[in-house]
Amino acid sequence: MHGNYPTLKEIVLELDPPDPVGLHCNEQLDSSEDEVDELATQATQDVTQPYQIVTTCGTCNRNVRLVVQCTGTDICQLHTLLLGSLEILCPVCAPKN
């Protein structure tokens, strides 16, 4: 720009189209990396370990203690059941029901 205010004569537009860029990535992951991740995930889910559970009796509200051995996935499912309609009964209330 040579003057104080831009004019249409001073604006230069380049009408050449931009160079096309390939949007496809040529990188590939080794399948072994994926398999290692999958195996690590499965290994952590398949390992069983003991879990102590303390809940209340569904009838008298006394504390009930359980120990279960299961996987992490299974303990999450048990947790969901205990939060729902599943009730554990204490040894005193169990024969009555």
Curated annotation (Swiss-Prot):
A cellular-component GO term for this protein: host cell nucleus
Keywords: Activator, DNA-binding, Early protein, G1/S host cell cycle checkpoint dysregulation by virus, Host cytoplasm, Host nucleus, Host-virus interaction, Inhibition of host innate immune response by virus, Inhibition of host interferon signaling pathway by virus, Interferon antiviral system evasion, Metal-binding, Modulation of host cell cycle by virus, Oncogene, Transcription, Transcription regulation, Viral immunoevasion, Zinc, Zinc-finger
GO biological process: DNA-templated transcription; symbiont-mediated perturbation of host cell cycle G1/S transition checkpoint; symbiont-mediated suppression of host innate immune response; symbiont-mediated suppression of host type I interferon-mediated signaling pathway
InterPro entries: Papilloma_E7
First and last residues of each zinc finger (unnamed): 57-93
Domain remarks: The E7 terminal domain is an intrinsically disordered domain, whose flexibility and conformational transitions confer target adaptability to the oncoprotein. It allows adaptation to a variety of protein targets and exposes the PEST degradation sequence that regulates its turnover in the cell.
HAMAP family referenced in this protein's UniProt entry, alphabetically: PPV_E7
The protein's role, per its UniProt record: Plays a role in viral genome replication by driving entry of quiescent cells into the cell cycle. Stimulation of progression from G1 to S phase allows the virus to efficiently use the cellular DNA replicating machinery to achieve viral genome replication. E7 protein has both transforming and trans-activating activities. Induces the disassembly of the E2F1 transcription factor from RB1, with subsequent transcriptional activation of E2F1-regulated S-phase genes. Interferes with host histone deacetylation mediated by HDAC1 and HDAC2, leading to transcription activation.
Protein name stated in the entry: Protein E7
Organism field: Human papillomavirus type 55
